[in-house]
Amino acid sequence: ILVVSFFGAGIREVIKLPGRVILLFSLRGMCLVIAMYLYFISLGSLPLSEVVSIFFVSPLLITLLSSIILKEKIGIHRISSVLIALVGVILIMRPGTENFKPEMLLALGAALSYAIFQIFTRSLKSEGNLYALVTIQNFCYLISAIPLLFINWFNPLEPTGNLSMDFLLRGPDYPTFQDMTFIIICAFSVLVLSITSSHAYRTVEASLLAPFEYVAIPFSIFWGIAIFGDWPSNLSWIGMSLILFGGIYAIYRERVREIEIISKVPMPASAAM
């Protein structure tokens, strides 16, 4: 009932929008669709913890793009946190070594697409409202799924040996009751994420909010080990730690900056009496 009422309100808001705004909202939604597909395709070949950690170069990209496109100011501390986390990503990917896998570039592409998606979110903060934004985003999900539905059901790809492509284009596995339960939980979680994340990026500076997304890294490590038995390598542990440290450092510096700003504000005369 809640979902139906939300999208009912969303459709009414979409109808009110001018064509230009609908186009921009749709471009934003397709950026997220591309990020989602690249992310899940990379999971066909890579451990969950590595995919999530590489994907979390996205807050770094959000910080940089917010400075270039949105003209938000980033100081030396934010730049330092970006560089620290970038070293972590390099340690995980290890380009030029036998540990590097081309599928890692898919996770990196997902990060870039997601960063552009959030820049759209921030730049469109004064256009439409949250109902319309999330509704168009979910219509983009639906439209992009239709071609894959026909491929998967009516012309599934024969196994190629490429785990990522097979994961995307193989024939359907009919879900069990347990599978459907997990799918429904995931769908509801994504809806909640869409609403809360979109609202946050519309109301707070993108470069300030981005580091908070790093909380997903320790969770991905835990679930990767607990469910799939994917234990990261030593260098991957170091890389993940650096990415997490970079995010925490950025959050800490923003908190220090807020305290410094507050302390410089003169106390009102009435409060001093």
Where are these predicted regions, by residue range?
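Structural signature of hydrophobic alpha-helical transmembrane segments
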Residues: I1, I41-S58, K101-S113, T176-V190, ...
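Membrane-interface interhelical linkers
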Residues: I1-L27, I143-I184, L191-V204, R253-M273
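Hydrophobic/small/kink-forming positions within alpha-helical transmembrane segments
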Residues: G29-Y37, P59-L64, V89, A111-A115, ...
